[in-house]
């Protein structure tokens, strides 16, 4: 091989070496950038993991509070139902309804009925239910 061929081969090899060196530098920069991104992502993963732990703890607290509230509500509902079932309706002499007819009115109703007046008309005149007049005439009341 001649000197000029060797010089040409040397120039070509030097050019390839410089190209490979530039490519190597570019890849090294990319590698550093990717390492930086990986480090950032790992840090973000830790932040997300910590937030997830806090969120799950808060969720467990809320669920426990909800269970306590449900138990309390169920107990109150049962107590209210029992109290409501134990209420006795008012009966007897302390009952708030007053007697609708006096003794005198009862006598008048019986006489008017025997005189031929209708029970419906008597009920309207005295402001009572026709059933009350019927019971009065039959002697169930008074």
Curated annotation (Swiss-Prot):
UniProt superkingdom: Viruses
Gene name for this UniProt entry: 46
Native organism: Mycobacterium phage L5 (Mycobacteriophage L5)
Region (Disordered), start-end ranges: 82-101
Protein name (database record): Gene 46 protein
């Amino acid at each position: 091989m001649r000197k000029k061929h060797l010089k040409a081969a040397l120039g070509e090899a030097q050019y390839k070496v410089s190209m490979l060196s530039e490519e190597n530098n570019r890849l090294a920069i990319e590698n550093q950038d990717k390492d930086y991104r990986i480090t950032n992502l790992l840090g973000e993963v830790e932040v997300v993991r910590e937030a997830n732990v806090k969120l799950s703890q808060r969720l467990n607290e809320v669920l426990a509070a909800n269970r306590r509230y449900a138990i309390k509500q169920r107990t109150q509902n049962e107590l209210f139902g029992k109290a409501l079932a134990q209420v006795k309706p008012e009966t007897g002499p302390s009952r708030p309804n007053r007697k609708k007819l006096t003794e005198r009115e009862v006598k008048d109703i019986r006489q008017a009925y025997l005189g031929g007046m209708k029970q419906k008309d008597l009920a309207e005149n005295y402001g009572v239910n026709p059933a009350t007049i019927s019971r009065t005439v039959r002697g169930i009341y008074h």
